[in-house]
């Protein structure tokens, strides 16, 4: 899979987005730094290993960078709710990302059911997204040659998820003992922002259709606002086909006829569910990259955010998604030759099929896969 850079995003500027599309990887680069001008110059980025297998996957990328000479330096910030007393603060993480080209590579942070701070319902993931205003989560669902799927179809669609409001607003309270009220926040401003983002994405990447996913038949005000806003934005893009679909029907359609989708846009909770369902269509959590995008910052992280705690330390996790995240990050940083070469090396290893992790029916370790990618890497 080759990559090319699209340097502007007219209606959502200054946006930053890296995503693969069709047979190539297409990359938006608005707030990214200039490429290195000196031979030995390296660009710095923040890494957040996270919990579970996150550190193993991040360290795999670090080893690939070291062995291949990719001109990147990492500053590590440890964020964890599992090891809360050892965790750095959100403020430190934000400062690190800000001084390191506004970019981070991140593993999954396990959400704890325990309140570490009295009255604080937001987990580290939500606090980080809100601190950086990472309003759009973008996950590209694409069939990789060499991975056998149950449906046998070539899929290529993108999920755009609003991730700063909705059910993730952390507004919960106990009315009386045994009765909990949880509030869902929906605003026209954020619905319009994510809708425009999705339509701009479709326009810039040559896609033909945007599907708004909702439950307005039941949540007539909240999801009704989202749907009406998407319908209004769609009128500004007459060349892009628009349709709406109820979330429960969407799940059925994804399982029965997933090839019908192109760009999907949806509120927060639905996006979380659909991301994971769709990842299962193309090989699972280990093969789908994603990114969280804001006006000034971008965090590259696997599209299916599972810490996989039970596999921690066993070197059995599939690093494909994390390595592809790193490739997208390199394109974002204008290191296109490096990003393209890394992505191609992953594609070659997966297609060849000699080195497969357990989730894909093989016995290779996380390190085995990374070593195979290094062997295939050419620049």
UniProtKB/Swiss-Prot annotation:
Residues annotated to bind NAD(+): 44-72
Cofactor, how bound (note): Binds 1 Mg(2+) or Mn(2+) ion per subunit.
Keywords: Magnesium, Manganese, Metal-binding, Mitochondrion, NAD, Oxidoreductase, Transit peptide, Tricarboxylic acid cycle
Phylogenetic classification of the source organism: Eukaryota, Metazoa, Ecdysozoa, Nematoda, Chromadorea
PANTHER family, A to Z: DECARBOXYLATING DEHYDROGENASES-ISOCITRATE, ISOPROPYLMALATE, TARTRATE, ISOCITRATE DEHYDROGENASE [NAD] SUBUNIT BETA, MITOCHONDRIAL
Site (Critical for catalysis): 168, 215
Cellular component GO terms held in the UniProt record: mitochondrion
Name this protein carries in UniProt: Probable isocitrate dehydrogenase [NAD] subunit beta, mitochondrial
């Amino acid at each position: 899979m080759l990559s090319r850079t699209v340097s502007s995003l007219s209606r959502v500027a200054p946006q930053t987005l890296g995503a693969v599309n069709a047979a190539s990887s297409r990359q938006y680069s608005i707030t990214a730094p200039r490429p290195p001008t000196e031979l030995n110059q390296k660009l710095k980025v923040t890494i957040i290993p996270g919990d579970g297998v996150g550190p193993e996957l991040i360290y795999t990328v670090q080893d690939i960078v070291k062995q291949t000479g990719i001109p990147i330096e990492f500053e590590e910030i440890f964020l964890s709710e599992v090891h809360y007393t050892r965790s750095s603060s959100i403020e430190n993480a934000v400062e690190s990302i800000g001084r390191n080209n506004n970019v981070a590579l991140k593993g999954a942070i396990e959400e704890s059911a325990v309140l570490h701070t009295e009255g604080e319902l937001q987990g580290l993931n939500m606090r980080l997204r809100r601190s950086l205003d990472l309003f759009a989560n973008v996950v590209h669902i694409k069939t990789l040659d060499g991975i056998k799927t149950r449906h046998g179809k070539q899929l290529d669609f993108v999920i755009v998820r609003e991730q700063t409001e909705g059910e993730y607003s952390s507004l919960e309270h106990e009315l009386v003992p045994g009765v909990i009220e949880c509030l869902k926040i929906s605003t026209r401003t954020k619905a319009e922002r994510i809708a425009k983002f999705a339509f701009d994405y479709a326009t810039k990447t040559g896609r033909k259709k945007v599907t708004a996913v909702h439950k307005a038949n039941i949540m007539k005000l909240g999801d009704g606002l989202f749907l009406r806003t998407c319908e209004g934005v769609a009128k500004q893009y007459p060349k892009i086909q628009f349709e709406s679909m109820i979330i429960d029907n969407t799940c059925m359609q994804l399982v029965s006829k997933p090839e019908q989708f192109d760009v999907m846009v949806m509120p927060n909770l639905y996006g979380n569910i659909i991301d994971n369902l769709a990842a299962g269509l193309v090989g699972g959590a280990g093969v789908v990259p994603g990114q969280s995008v804001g006006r000034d910052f971008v965090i590259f992280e696997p599209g299916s955010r599972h810490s996989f705690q039970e596999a921690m330390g066993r070197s059995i996790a599939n690093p494909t998604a994390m390595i592809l995240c790193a490739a997208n990050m390199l394109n974002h940083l204008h290191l296109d030759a490096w990003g393209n070469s890394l992505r191609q090396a992953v594609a070659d290893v997966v297609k060849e099929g000699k080195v497969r992790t357990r989730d894909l029916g093989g016995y290779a370790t996380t390190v085995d896969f990374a070593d195979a990618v290094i062997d295939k890497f050419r620049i």
